[in-house]
Structure formats: C-alpha cells, structure tokens
From Swiss-Prot:
Zn(2+) binds at residues 83, 99, 106. It comes from the Archaea. Homodimer. Coiled coil: none annotated. Binds 1 Mg(2+) ion per subunit. Binds 1 zinc ion per subunit. The gene is hisI. InterPro entries: PRA-CH (IPR026660), PRib_AMP_CycHydrolase_dom (IPR002496), PRib_AMP_CycHydrolase_sf (IPR038019). GO terms for biological process: L-histidine biosynthetic process. The keyword Metal-binding applies. This is Phosphoribosyl-AMP cyclohydrolase.
Length: 129
C-alpha cells in the first residue's frame, strides 16, 4: 500500500453511477490537471494496494493500469474525496505523459482547438503494434 489509508472510505459510501466514480488526476507538485477517468471498486482497491493508478475502461469493459503499455505510470501520493462523495481527486507523480496522444496532460487543447500543452512523447513510437 502506498500510504496509510485506513480506515479507507467504503466504496459503497461513495455516490457512484452504475458502480463508477469519476477520478480527476492532478500532478502533485504543479497541480496541473492531467486527466479524468472512471474507477469502480476494483480499480480503487488496486490503486490503493499498488500505489499506481488503475481505472475502469467503459469502452472495453475492463480494468486497466495507467501506463501498462507506455510505461507512463502515475504514482499516487494522495487520494481525496469531494464534499458530495461523488468524485475523487488523485494527486500523483506523473512518469512521462498522461495523454495517449503524446501530451503531458489530456487537456492539451483550448476550446478553439489550439494546442496549448506540452508534447512529451511520440505515440507511434510508444504504441507500436
């Protein structure tokens, strides 16, 4: 376990929708928002157990470890729950980029589509078939 979370909030006490809760991932030092994803009970438990973020893929209907393919893992430093108990904030140390498009953050574009984020890797080189 990455830190002492006991007593951990019971997942059933969280206000999940269809067993999923939104997780906002933020860089622990810079406070940059890196990504948002969903967690189910298993993903949260695995994250707490390993100290590496795990999420539930709604499209693939399976658990996934962030960085499993790319090596760009997120080392969890702290987990917070919001006042309504319907979302989580994960403060992490990001290794490499968080975005599968090659950027440090998934929020690399503004509303007009202009790239405003830092590209940190080439996806074609990382996600070779």
């Amino acid at each position: 376990m990455f830190c002492n979370l006991s007593p951990m909030i019971d997942f059933d006490a969280l206000k999940s929708e269809k067993g999923l809760i939104l997780a906002v991932v933020q860089d622990q030092l810079s406070r940059e928002v890196l990504m948002c994803a969903y967690m189910n009970r298993e993903a949260l438990e695995k994250t707490v157990e390993t100290g590496i973020t795990h999420f539930w893929s709604r499209s693939r209907q399976q658990l996934w470890k962030k960085g499993e393919t790319s090596g760009h893992v997120q080392k969890v430093k702290e987990i917070r729950v919001d006042c309504d108990m319907d979302s989580l904030l994960l403060l992490v140390e990001q290794v490499g980029g968080a975005c599968h498009m090659g950027y440090r953050s998934c929020f690399y574009r503004n509303l007009e589509g202009e790239v405003v984020g830092e590209k940190v890797f080439e996806p074609d080189e990382v996600y070779k078939s």
